[in-house]
Amino acid sequence: MLLLLLLLGPGSGLGAVVSQHPSRVICKSGTSVKIECRSLDFQATTMFWYRQFPKQSLMLMATSNEGSKATYEQGVEKDKFLINHASLTLSTLTVTSAHPEDSSFYICSAR
């Protein structure tokens, strides 16, 4: 089994409030996990996805703008971590074929 811990992340930048769902996931190795990030107080033009391993610093994975492809940071596997920002209030992160080394905190923020 694989444990992916997902946090509710406060907004950044202009103080956007976001909500993540689900808040935590346990899944079998090899399955995919989808995380939704919603901007609650305004339409977010930019969403940021981060991950944090235990006892390590927060790492920016990717930035996305509504209707555009995400811009991934160096070293992030874009085929493994699929980001979709289809509307101004919603972005999703799908971890494909999750394995124990993907266990992490996944956090979003909006601006």
From Swiss-Prot:
Any Gene Ontology biological process: cell surface receptor signaling pathway
Regions annotated as coiled coil: none
Primary residence: membrane
Top-rank taxon, per record: Eukaryota
Membrane-spanning residues: none
Positions of disulphide bridges: C37-C108
Keyword Ligase among record annotations: no
Gene Ontology cellular-component terms listed: plasma membrane; T cell receptor complex
Pfam (any one): V-set
SMART domains: IGv
Signal peptide: 1-15
Function according to Swiss-Prot or TrEMBL: V region of the variable domain of T cell receptor (TR) beta chain that participates in the antigen recognition. Alpha-beta T cell receptors are antigen specific receptors which are essential to the immune response and are present on the cell surface of T lymphocytes. Recognize peptide-major histocompatibility (MH) (pMH) complexes that are displayed by antigen presenting cells (APC), a prerequisite for efficient T cell adaptive immunity against pathogens.
Subunit comment: Alpha-beta TR is a heterodimer composed of an alpha and beta chain; disulfide-linked. The alpha-beta TR is associated with the transmembrane signaling CD3 coreceptor proteins to form the TR-CD3 (TcR or TCR). The assembly of alpha-beta TR heterodimers with CD3 occurs in the endoplasmic reticulum where a single alpha-beta TR heterodimer associates with one CD3D-CD3E heterodimer, one CD3G-CD3E heterodimer and one CD247 homodimer forming a stable octameric structure. CD3D-CD3E and CD3G-CD3E heterodimers preferentially associate with TR alpha and TR beta chains, respectively.
Name recorded for this polypeptide: T cell receptor beta variable 20-1
Taxonomic source organism: Homo sapiens (Human)
Gene name of the record: TRBV20-1
